[in-house]
Amino acid sequence: MHKRPLKQLLCAVAAAIGLSASLTASAADPLKVGFVYIGPIGDHGWTYQHEQGRKALAEKLGEQITTNYVENVAEGADAERVIRNMAKDKYDLIFTTSFGYMNPTLKVAKQFPKVTFEHATGYKQDKNLGTYLARTYEGRYVGGFLAAKMTKTKKVGYVASFPIPEVIRDINAIQLALNKYNPGTEIKVVWVNSWFDPGKEADAANALIDQGVDVVFQHTDSPAPIQAAERRGVYAVGYASDMAHFGPKAVLTSIVNDWGPHYIQATQSVLDHTWKSQDYWGGLKEGTVELPISDLVPVAVKTEAEQIIADIKSGALHPFTGPIKDQAGVEKIPAGATATNAELASMNFYVEGMKAEIPK
């Protein structure tokens, strides 16, 4: 029998041990998870809530993952650059958190098929790209009910960002509630063409209040509209996070988004190799949307609002159940039918009762 020299045997054993250790270390490498944010993490609104979701994810999954984020990323070419750099830096899972990141995310996803991507509020998927949305329109409908009960001028204001389906359907949800609970109440809209610009947001809120609005909604990310409402002595409804502390004498409720559970579920599925592209919608039932109702709201009104929330959670009520007509009187959703997710995701019309026009 041929005998190998002791030194050669020891070298072979050491090499085997080294290879084993290398494989073990590789198998234990944490999953790299990246987040791309439209605004600053301190905006107290949309980006702030996504950052809270990232923190919840990091706390839950601990050493299994590492997380990082880039804030203040403009939609368009800048977003594409940041997303691509994350993919090049070997991030395994990338969340892109603004509607205008949709096409840049899709483009980069096609170039990096081994990276998993999830895009918030969009509607384009691919094998390695999923989408996720909050049914904020459910919260808007409840907010519309509160506005219907609390307004004295029958004029409600909306500080709007961009005329995209998400914003349009949220405005429509408020108008549908106003039509039902205080017919003849109108929504006045001011577009600021920005997600985060406290100066413009405050100016828009003040312009609405100057027109007689006594309940201010917003689809922007800073608390500036809330603060303007507080100063002017009118009511407001916060957005994305609970904004009550910015206007304790103004805020009736806030449409709060809790992204943590989805971030945890999606990341765990990547770790488990069970992730599949999907179009996820989370609402009141799932806890993705929450509505802390202020004590400014009378007890009887609060009780009725809580029943509306319960009905939405149970499926007994869907804000977009027909018959629903557009502002020109054309039927969009027939009696007994409910808008599909695809119809909600592409909504490009105002419902009956709206007097404003959608910018072209």
Each language-model region and where it sits:
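Bacterial N-terminal signal peptides that target proteins for export
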Residues: 2-12, 21
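A residue-level marker of the well-folded mature domains of exported/periplasmic proteins
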Residues: 28-360
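Repetitive helical segments and hydrophobic/amphipathic motifs
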Residues: 16-17
